[in-house]
């Protein structure tokens, strides 16, 4: 059994969107981004058991299938597979830093990842590793990575969900890129977000988070020490919870 320290560490879940993993020069992965994130993960593992839900948008998005003239179902399936590719890349980077991780998948791909068959699969992965990477979404088409994020947060009994946005530092009353009068919201409750249709994540995922009393922290993933500052309540971020 893996033991990085003797104290009981709470679990957190980090969402890494596929769009944030890439470079503007059309390369699917940004090495600088991964190095920056991993340096922060090294610090986090001393205090937390870290779960990571990873998207696939740097490779393909399920809802963009029309431009390829393929059925939406196939587009979603390709999106699911893309998250496994991204998860494996992250695991390879963690291996390069001698950090112990497990890649779990909601779909069967035994040569790459351990399929999530039960709660015991998840608990065992956390017991034996510093980081658990969740790929394959929910395993079903038409469900977003947000839904997978909420599901894994509930399953892991996470104390917080950290959602790193690409170039956005939290939640606003409107899209700040389109509305100069948009107001930044440092704190927010679920009911207000739903009532005002703030579109933080899809409603299925958001409702699951609300019903399970999960705390969500939204921040700019590209900011310096973004993960560490968000957890330590430094810098600019939005906290969403029931109150």
Swiss-Prot record:
Reaction(s) this enzyme catalyzes, per UniProt: UMP + ATP = UDP + ADP
Entry GO CC: cytoplasm
Entry's Gene Ontology BP terms: 'de novo' CTP biosynthetic process; UDP biosynthetic process
Keyword Signal: no
Residues reported to bind ATP: 15-18, 57, 61, 166, 172, 175
Regulation: Inhibited by UTP.
GO molecular function, one term: ATP binding
Pathway(s): Pyrimidine metabolism; CTP biosynthesis via de novo pathway; UDP from UMP (UMPK route): step 1/1
Compartment(s) of residence: Cytoplasm
Top-level class of the enzyme under EC nomenclature: transferase
UniProt keyword annotations, A-Z: ATP-binding, Cytoplasm, Kinase, Nucleotide-binding, Pyrimidine biosynthesis, Transferase
Source species, domain of life: Bacteria
EC number: 2.7.4.22
Chain sites annotated for binding UMP: 56, 138-145
InterPro entries (alphabetical): AceGlu_kinase-like_sf, Asp/Glu/Uridylate_kinase, Uridylate_kinase, Uridylate_kinase_bac
Classification via Pfam families: AA_kinase
Complex formation: Homohexamer.
Entry's family note: Belongs to the UMP kinase family.
Job description of the protein: Catalyzes the reversible phosphorylation of UMP to UDP.
Name under which the protein is recorded: Uridylate kinase
Organism this protein belongs to: Mycoplasma genitalium (strain ATCC 33530 / DSM 19775 / NCTC 10195 / G37)
């Amino acid at each position: 059994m893996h033991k990085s320290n003797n104290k009981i560490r709470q679990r957190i879940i980090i969402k890494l969107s596929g769009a944030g993993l890439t470079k503007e020069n059309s390369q699917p992965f940004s090495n600088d981004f991964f190095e920056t994130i991993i340096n922060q993960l090294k610090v986090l593992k001393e205090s937390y058991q870290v779960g990571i839900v990873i998207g696939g948008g740097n490779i393909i998005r399920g809802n963009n299938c029309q431009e390829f003239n393929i059925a939406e179902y196939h587009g979603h399936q390709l999106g699911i597979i893309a998250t496994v590719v991204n998860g494996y890349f992250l695991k390879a980077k963690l291996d390069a830093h001698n950090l112990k991780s497990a890649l779990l998948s909601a779909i069967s791909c035994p040569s790459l990842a351990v399929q999530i068959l039960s709660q015991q699969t998840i608990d065992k992965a956390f017991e034996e590793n510093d980081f658990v990477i969740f790929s394959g979404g929910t395993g079903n088409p038409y469900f977003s990575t947000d839904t997978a994020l909420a599901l894994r947060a509930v399953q892991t009994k996470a104390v917080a969900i950290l959602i790193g946005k690409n170039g956005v530092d939290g939640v606003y009353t409107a899209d700040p890129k389109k509305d100069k009068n948009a107001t930044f919201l440092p704190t927010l409750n679920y009911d207000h977000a739903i009532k005002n249709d703030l579109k933080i994540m899809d409603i299925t995922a958001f409702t699951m988070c609300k019903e399970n009393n999960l705390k969500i922290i939204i921040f700019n993933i590209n900011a310096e020490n973004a993960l560490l500052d968000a957890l330590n309540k430094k810098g600019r971020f939005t906290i969403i919870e029931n109150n």
